[in-house]
Amino acid sequence: MARRYLMTYGDELTGAILCGTGEQASATLFAGKTVAGILGAFKGQRYRSEFIRKTSFKGYNDRFEKRTENDWLTKDQSIVDWYNGHKFCTFGFTINGYKTLFEVLTYIQKQENYNKIPKNLPVYMIAGEDDPVGNYGEGVKHIYQQYKDSGIKDISIKLYPNDRHEILNELDKETVYADVADWIAGHM
């Protein structure tokens, strides 16, 4: 959502920090939109599909010990346990919510939309190297290169070794917060 915001309102910003961003294969997004459209037609837009919830996050936990279904979020087990026990964290989106998510992801991954981001907007990309959302750092590096190729002048990237998706809740979060504070101090 932050990347979509940059494409629409980037000229109103002083800088942007993208945390835990990623990308999905176009075919995956097309399939997701199609399935959500079909389910929405039969079940309604407010229906919550366990199938779409599970397939949307399928594989995210594959590289980690299977203690819970959300261990991909962070190495900090107390955070994962808190997340799993909180009703506002573990709900699935409605069909409309997933369809909108797939549409936004499709939009932000088009090269012509990268070009809508102001070239003078400072952007700092941070992510965990073990984050499946960012394809274990490779997706984040690809987005970084796309931003550079689109002409963004002040862009930097930092990948945190052994960190997963929620780097602001990781065991080394103090380092992450210090890096963010340093970037802000140098750009604002």
What are these regions (language model features)?
Residues I117-V123, S150-K153:
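Short, proline-enriched alpha-helix->beta-strand connector loops that line the catalytic pocket
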Residues C19-G20, I108-Q109, D179-W183:
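Non-catalytic cap/lid and distal C-terminal segments of serine-dependent acyl enzymes
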Residues F93-N115:
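Active-site nucleophile elbow and catalytic-triad environment of alpha/beta-hydrolase enzymes
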Residues M125-A127:
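Short beta-strand/loop motif that positions the catalytic acidic residue
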Residues A2-F88:
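Alpha/beta-hydrolase-fold enzymes
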Residues K148-M188:
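Catalytic active-site module of serine/aspartate enzymes centered on a nucleophile-bearing elbow/loop
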Residues E129-P132, D163-R164:
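Acidic beta-to-alpha connecting loop that harbors the catalytic carboxylate
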Residues P132-H142:
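Conserved alpha/beta-hydrolase "acid-adjacent" motif
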